[in-house]
Structures are given as structure tokens and as C-alpha cells.
Amino acid sequence: MQQQSLRVLSIVLALTAGISCRELLADDGLLPPVTAPIVNGIKVPDGFHVELYADDDLAHDIHSMTIDSKGRVVVSGPGYVRILIDSDNDGRADSFKQFADKPDTGSQGMFFLGSSLLCSGDQGLQIFRDDNQDDIADGPPQVFLKISAGGEHHVHSIQKGPDGWWYVMAGNFAGVTAAYATVPTSPIKQPVSGTLLRLKPDLSGGEIVSDGFRNAYDFTFNGTGDFFTYDSDDERDISLPWYLPTQVFHVLPLSNAGYVTTGLKRPGSYPDMPPVLATFGRGSPTGVTCYRHNQFPEPYRNALFMLDWTLGRILAVPLTQEGSGWKKDGVVFGEGQDQFGFAPTDIEVAPDGSVFVSVGGRGTRGSVFRIVWDAAQLPTVSSDGDSTTRQIDTVLDAPQPNSSWSRAEWIPLAKSLGAAPFQQAASMEKRPASQRMRAIEILVEVYGGLDRATASKLSLAGSGLVRARTAWAVGRSRPEAPDTEILKKLVSDRDPFVQRFALEALSSATSAASFTTTISSIAAALASNDRSVRFSAALLVSRMNDDHRNALAKALANNLRGLMWFHMGRCLRSPLQSVPSAAVALSVLTSKDASAEDRYDAVRILQMTLGDVGPAKNRPVMFDGYAPALSLASIERELNPIMTKVAAVFPSGDAHLDHELIRLIAMTRPFNRDLFSRLLTSITDSTLPADDIHRLAAISQFEIERSYDESVATAQALLGIDIKIRKY
């Protein structure tokens, strides 16, 4: 006690004298002494500084980085995987140990499970074993999943999820097909573009969780178990109407992120898109992590951190709960300055809470930097309770719990304690929600899931976060046939955050009874005031049989918005061309009582229920977003009265709505000279070039003969685009 008092006094005196907590931590061996070179070429917020941990002489052209089970930085580039060694504990690596002379391509994603390394590269996803634990791979790697690897749009990150399954991000050229959905519970059967895969803990089978990405390189989980990724733009389209900036997605199971072709990328404002939390303009997304430690201050705790290779930026999205999801936000946390070469490739949170960032790629200089908060707080160790209580707290409070180094510490301890203490911890109302959620996750991964009694009790928890994690656990405990009595109650929960997780828990269900029991609750969710709850419910429609769908339609007969979202759900995984479905969306679009948001959603759903826009054989790719994906010949007679009503609301005076009305008009190829004239005359000297291209692409779809004056006006509009681009 006297020593502790003296220690506290020394801290107070040191702070009074201007000595930082970091220096005291270094004295105690809790953080390395500050002898690593300070880097001024990377600008970070006040109160942070950047140190050089390793330079190009130790690792050239770093493609990816991880921290192994012993807490050491491991990097990979072409022909190497290296463990960086700080032998004198001065905060800078002074040597390396060559773990492997592969992959030849370098790895774009690594994860240590004990002493074995799972990584992407060369022939696909592979495992290097080090059974004798000498920090050198025992031999050539074993490929456990053949998938295109090594290219910039191939397979990337591999991580352990909170359920103990493996999660893998693959780019749009990785070649993921229906053959990769080998488990019946796979949410998606026919993937499109880039994908997020989920593999069994023993790697014996896999699922496709989400698709539609262009080239998301990395992803992360936050403390509530949500997925997040940072997807790339297509910089060649920067002045075109179908250009989309880099986007931070909140990834929902069963969702499609909207990348179809180079000429068709669906904007985040669409009702059929997962939430976009931030956009960051041009860039090349690389590493992503969620800061689940305590060395950084608020608001960076539990925030997302993403890297942009092209512009040399570290981006941050603080996560603030809003409704069923997360508030849109985003800031630049760090960036290269004064012509300092900074091409970040990966980011990891260290055991001490500092953050490592690697650089490299395309043959460039390799380095590893460490970002540190200057006013680091001393770790607190609770002396309350007995030894078992402290051990439980250690497991529940483990930082970065999905990381290799954290798992190496908490998993053996969790296994030694048995399931009962975690069942009790999950149920204790006095415990923080964060601890209770971790107890639930540990029961799922380590002990096979929640039993019915525990799940029933937790479904009544006072914390919405705990109820949401319970819903997730019910889904992951028995994915094919989750306990629907519990989920039915949670889908109808008072908290939309809980509702969303309960709906997601059904995304792997293969049992018809799973939907029979919950159909009334799903119908109510389709009519929810929360957008992501409606979307999560609509995503489930693709997994239902005709009886379930008929029951949903009947339950929603008197709720126009809910019925519209139901029909959208019918379109999400298979093309639909249905005049009755289109009529529902048209009713919302033309209603004077509908909100601006509902009318915008209606015009998009009207596109979808008429077969949607999309690519077709022998059609230039630039028209993928303006021409029908399916022939409209079979519904031509019924289409005319629909488009007459659409023409009556265009232009609406709402630029956001008109943008999609123009697309709808284009895809129906109307014989309507008045609409043609309205579109052409809306191109003026003050309109933006991307908007002009949007209108001209739509005009090109009209099957009418142009007058001489109309042809001249069209030509002038085309010629004016270059002038406007130079001007703006």
C-alpha cells in the first residue's frame, strides 16, 4: 500500500513538473522508452505523435501487416513474411526473423492462430505451420481455399470473427462464384463482384455473407459485432454521373454494396443499399481496424480507422449509435505532409494501445510507423473481488479481442474457467454492457452458443445492446434453425437496434419454420420508421418460400410503405418484372402525402419492379445505368399508363428525385416528345457536366426522330461538356 501511495504521489509530482505519463509508463516497462525517431512528415491531431518503428532496410514494399500471438509486428511483401524484432526494447525494430520466403506475390492479409499463419497469396488462402515454434515456417504452405490471389483486386484480408468463424474479404476479380457457398446456411448463393466470405472454424466449408463490393481491401468488427469496410472508387469515372467516391460501409448480412459494372454503381442513397457511414472522395482503400483499446482518448475509442494509399491518409469514423445503426461521420485523422512519401497499406492496434501503420505497395519504400497518444493513462488493475472474479474481468475486458495477440491471452483463461461464470456475467445487470456482450460472444465461440434458458433470460435484459447481442448469439448458435420464439420477440423489440440484429439472425436460416413463426414480426419490421430495420427485413424475403411471401403481402395490405419495401425485397436476389408490384411503388411516388424520402425510395423501387437497369449483351457499358436489364416487351401495354403518371411528376423540383426519375424515364424508352424536350431544355450553361451527361445518356434512349433544332441542341450540349469540365 505504501509503495502504491508513493507511486501515485510520484505521478502527481511528475505531471506537475511536465513529465508525461508515457515516460512513467516507460520507466515501469509498460511502454517502450521514447528513443524511436519522431516522424514529422505525417500530420496527426494535437496530442499525438508518430514514431518510426522500422524502415525499408528491414522490410521493403510492405503489402500487409499483422501482430502475432506474441505481440510482435509481422509484415509481408513479395517473397517474404518477416517478424520484426525490437531486441533492446527501445521502441524501434533493429532486426527481423524470416518466417517464410513466400508468398511470391506477397500477402494482402495475415492472421496468426497460435504459431501458425493463415494468409492470402500465390494460389489462394494458405496456412504456414510452425509446430516447433521456432518462428520459422516448418515447410511450404498448405492451400486451404483456392481463390485468385496476389493481384490488387484479388483475395485480401482474413480475420477471426467474434463467433470463432473465419471472415475473408475478396475483391471483384477474385473469382468468387456460387461454388464458394458450400454450406446450406450461406446467406448468398449467387455472388456478384467483391465478397465477404465466412468460413467454418475448421475451414471445412464456407458461406458468402455480403457482396457487391468493388475492391474492399480490409474490414473490421466493432464492439457490437457489426462489420465495416472501406470500398474503392473508380477514379477513371471522376467526371461522369456514375462515379462514386470511396465509401465506408456498414455491412449487413445478405446485402449487396452496389458495384455491378464499370458503368453501373448504385449510390448509397438507394433503399436497396447498405448504410454508407462516410465518403472520402478519390482514393485507394487499404487497411481497416476498429480501435477497441484504451490508450487513445475519446472520440477515437471504438472508432473505425481506415487507410487511403493514393492520397496518403489515415481516416477515422467515430461510431455513435443512431437508431438501428450508426451516425454518418468521418474525419481525416492523419496524412503525409511536406512531400513526405506516405503510402499506407495496413493498420493494427498494438498490445499497448498504440497503433502501427505500414507503408509500401507497387514496389515502393517499406516502413512501419507507430502512432502514440502523448498523455497515455496508466493501466488500472482492479483489486476488488477474488481471484476468479479478477480472471473473469480480465477475459471480458481484453482489448482488441479478435486479434491474434489478445486471443492468445484470453482464450486459455476462458477455457479454464468454464461456461458457468460467463453465463452468470452475461446475466448480471450491474455489469457494463460491454462486458455482458463479450460474455455472450465467449459463450458462442468457446462453449457452442447460448442454451435456451440463458437466451430467454437475456432477451429481457435492460440493456438494448445486450438484447441485440443475444439476438446475434441465437442466430450464430444454430444458424440453420435459430430459436424463433426468442427471435420473434426480439424482432418486435422496442429498440430498433435490437430489431435489426434479430432480423440478421435469420439471414442464415434454412428451416421454413423459422419464417413461419416470425412472419408477423417481419411484416411489422417492413413498415418500421427505421430505414435499416426495413432494409434488414426486406433482405430476408429472398430466403422465403411463396407461402411466406404471400403471408407477408397479406399482412401489409393496408400499409403502402411496408408493402413497397416487401416488393423491393422480392427483387433483391432475382430479377422481377411485375406490374402489380410497380403499381404499389407508383402509388407512393404520386402520393401528395408521401415524404420526400418515401418518394425517392419509390422511384428506385419502381425501376427494380420493372426489371431494373443493367448490362446487356452488345450494349456499351456506359448505358448500363440507363437501359433496361430485361426486355419490356411483355409489359408494354401495362407500362404506358404507368409512364404517363411518371411523366406528370417530372420535373418534381427535387433534384435528388429528378435524377432517378430521369433514369426511370430512360430505361422505359418512351415515345414521348414532350419528355424528350423537357430533358433537352434542362441542359443549360449553368448545369454541371456530370448532370449534362446524365441527361444526354437518358435522351439517347428515346426512340423518337429528332428535329434539326433538337439535333443541334444535343450536339451543342455534348460539345459544352469539355468546356464545363475545364471551367469547373
Regions found by a protein language model. Name each.
Residues 430-432, 462-463, 494-495, 529-530, ...:
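Short inter-helical turns and helix N-cap capping residues of alpha-solenoid HEAT/ARM repeat scaffolds
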Residues 630-654:
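Alpha-solenoid helical repeat scaffolds
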